[in-house]
């Protein structure tokens, strides 16, 4: 061993340095993964090869002492020491160190190759094999996805999927109706400036709503749903006005609409601007809804409009029954409905107070964000349900529900078209009047409701006068 070291010391030192550098470079590439996983066995490569002095420029005894001390520090099991000795490749685990590659055996294998390039290729192949083992372990350690736990804490990441901003919906759902009430009050204050005749005594709504003749006529002639709606309207006006008198007025509201159900605590005000007039409609959020003001509109509606006004029909047919027939056959579920059935239950369990419209938006956003491969099982379930439905009901034919219509000036018009016509006429009317700004949607709804109440009042007064004359 000493003869070979003396014969060509420079060459052995250079080869040892190159070998140590290559092994250390491979170790540095894997340092981050080894530090992140302390339980994984790590390979320890002693770094004394770089620090080994050149034998040509230093005494032989010093080099042997440095080499032997370094090997002893790393608990090497090699039998010999020296410049050309290779360190043992150790694996550090929680149970201690173990030798993976013996330094003497590694030296013999490398020295069996004659050329320098062959030795480098041999070491590169060893490093490549270790790298492939590391990649295989990394791929095998991917976490197995457990079933989704129906826990409110685990539902939040699910709601963030898709293009839709689910976090904003949840935030709006938590804050609720406070700013919506403020927007209504602020718009009503603006309406007092643009509609002075409407709120300053131009129309006596109290006399209209508290008229006993009108109330008796309504109770006797109108169908039960419309009569009950009007009576509820009369009762809610006084209660809402009393509550509105104690509400704090807001000049300008720039925050977005909230879907919260929490009502703000009323603040006492000495003189409220709303206390000087009567409102012809309720301040609830369901004013102008189709279910209350258009119950008289049905496919079988018929009648004549009031002279001089364009309004809904006065002679009302029986409303369409809402209850479905016991023999009604439901349509088979499509792929989205199959997928959303279980997802909707999970969201409702986590957020019981969330509105159904917000849940539908979240589910629709997540469904759009899913890939075709993720949707494929649900499309297969849709095909299976469709075939099963066809076998169970071979004579089934889908018949869509007819559109709701109203009779205006002897013509059948859909409810949505009627709303569009009324809005267009009001826009033209306000545009011709000088000194008035463009009305808001709230003002347009208010004017439309006033016309409906006036039509009902005028018609029932005429009916009462005719009955009295007879």
UniProtKB/Swiss-Prot annotation:
Q: Flavoprotein as a keyword?
A: no
Which cysteines are cross-linked by disulfides? none
The residue ranges flagged as biased composition, category Low complexity, are 60-79
- Comp. bias regions, Basic and acidic residues: 14-24
Q: What is its main location?
A: nucleus
The organism's superkingdom is given as Eukaryota
> Where is it expressed, tissue-wise?
Expressed in body wall muscle and head and tail neurons. Specifically expressed in O(2) and CO(2)-sensing neurons, including BAG and URX sensory neurons.
Q: How does a null allele present? A: Hermaphrodites have an egg laying defective phenotype and a reduced brood size. They display a protruding vulva phenotype and there is a failure of anchor cells to fuse to uterine seam cells (anchor cell-block). Animals also have defective vulval morphogenesis and gonad migration with increased pi cell divisions, which thus leads to an improper uterine-vulval connection. Defective response to CO(2) sensing.
UniProt DNA-binding residue ranges: 329-397
Query: A Gene Ontology CC term for this entry?
Result: nucleus
CDD domains (alphabetical): HMG-box_EGL13-like
Query: Keywords, A to Z?
Result: Differentiation, DNA-binding, Nucleus, Transcription, Transcription regulation
Composition-biased stretches (Polar residues): 294-316
Q: Where in the cell is it found?
A: Nucleus
> Which BP terms from GO are recorded?
anatomical structure morphogenesis; asymmetric neuroblast division; cell fate commitment; cell fate specification; neuron fate determination; regulation of DNA-templated transcription; regulation of transcription by RNA polymerase II; vulval development
For this chain, one GO molecular function annotation is: DNA-binding transcription factor activity, RNA polymerase II-specific
Region ranges (Disordered)? 1-79, 294-328
**What does it do?**
Probable transcription factor that is required for uterine and neuronal cell fate decisions. Controls genes required for the specification and differentiation of O(2) and CO(2)-sensing neurons and for maintaining URX sensory neuronal cell fate.
Give the protein name, as stated in the record. Transcription factor egl-13
């Amino acid at each position: 061993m000493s003869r070979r070291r003396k014969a060509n010391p420079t060459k052995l030192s250079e080869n040892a340095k190159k070998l140590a550098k290559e092994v250390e470079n491979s170790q540095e590439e894997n340092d981050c993964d080894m530090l992140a996983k302390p339980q994984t066995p790590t390979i320890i490569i002693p770094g004394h090869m770089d620090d080994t002095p050149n034998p040509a420029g230093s005494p032989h005894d010093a080099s042997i002492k440095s080499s032997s001390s370094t090997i002893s520090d790393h608990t090497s099991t090699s039998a010999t020491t020296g410049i050309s000795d290779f360190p043992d490749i150790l694996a550090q685990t929680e149970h201690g160190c173990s030798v993976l590659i013996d330094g003497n055996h590694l030296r013999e294998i490398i020295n069996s190759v004659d050329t320098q390039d062959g030795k480098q290729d041999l070491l590169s192949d060893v490093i490549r094999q270790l790298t492939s083992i590391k990649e295989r372990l990394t791929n095998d350690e991917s976490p197995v996805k457990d079933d989704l736990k129906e826990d409110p804490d685990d539902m939040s990441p699910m709601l963030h999927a898709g293009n839709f901003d689910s976090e904003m919906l949840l935030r709006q759902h938590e804050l609720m109706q406070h700013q919506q009430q403020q927007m209504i009050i602020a718009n009503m204050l603006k309406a007092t400036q643009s509609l002075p005749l409407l709120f300053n005594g131009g129309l006596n709504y109290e006399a209209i709503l508290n008229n006993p003749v009108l109330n008796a006529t309504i109770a006797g002639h109108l169908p039960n749903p419309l009569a009950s709606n009007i009576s509820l309207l009369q009762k809610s006006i006084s209660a809402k006005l009393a509550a509105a008198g104690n509400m704090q007025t807001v000049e300008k509201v720039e925050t977005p609409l909230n879907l919260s159900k929490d009502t703000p605590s009323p603040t006492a005000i000495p003189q409220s601007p709303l206390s000087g007039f009567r409102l012809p409609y309720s301040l609830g959020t369901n004013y102008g809804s189709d279910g209350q003001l258009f119950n008289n509109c049905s496919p079988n509606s018929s009648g004549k409009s009031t002279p001089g006004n364009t309004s809904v029909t006065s002679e009302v047919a029986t409303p369409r029954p809402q209850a479905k027939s016991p023999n009604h056959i439901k349509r088979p579920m499509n792929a989205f409905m199959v997928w959303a059935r279980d997802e909707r239950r999970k969201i409702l369990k986590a957020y019981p107070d969330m509105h159904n419209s917000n849940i539908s938006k979240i589910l629709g956003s997540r469904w759009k964000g899913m890939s075709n491969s993720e949707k494929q099982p649900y499309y297969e379930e849709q095909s299976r349900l469709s075939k099963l439905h066809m076998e169970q009901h071979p004579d089934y034919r889908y018949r869509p529900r007819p559109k709701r219509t109203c009779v205006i000036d002897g013509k059948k018009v859909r409810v949505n078209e009627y709303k569009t016509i009324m809005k267009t006429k009001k826009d033209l009317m306000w545009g011709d009047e000088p000194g008035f700004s463009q009305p808001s949607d709230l003002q347009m709804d208010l004017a439309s409701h006033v016309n409906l109440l006036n039509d009902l009042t005028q018609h029932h007064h005429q009916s009462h006068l005719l009955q009295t004359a007879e």
